[in-house]
């Protein structure tokens, strides 16, 4: 198997960054923002930029992704010839001096060198399933199909999102940027409700260009805030469900 050169890897990383930037631009559209929220519900443990990469490379069809080894551990083998999707991983190592001792910063904390290697993930449609294996997402949906829509559930999720994201805002801050903060809370509630199998037709997501002013940086920040809060809530729900 031919290994790529450093220049080829750097070029591919730049291509991925270009895909991320393109994805951010698309999030200005409210329908695309809602599609992003749907993806966060499926891939809440991934960073917002990797969610955009999965959205882009799967053309909106990915339902559950994992690396080659992860699929193998689940008893499922990736089909030969499948190329998968490229996302950005995370790696770090301790920086040492010439004597092998860990280097520290001015506060005495160990210094780590961080880099973001390209990793490949495959959608579940790209594998040969083990018939004994049941998809964890399918288990969740099966367990929650009987849930009926309830306004109090929507309110609880919305207010929980506010607590996670906005509890420490300075006085007067909420009023200045109410559109952003309400969008964050409603987006998180939408993701969690959809994950739980609740009816999400009653959820109203504000016009993105209205609250963002067209700022790509603000859209990125909001996308990550929403993902983090949704991950916290869904992880808590998963833990509670499995106990």
Feature names for model-found ranges:
Residues 1-243:
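N-terminal accessory/interface modules of nucleic-acid-binding and processing proteins
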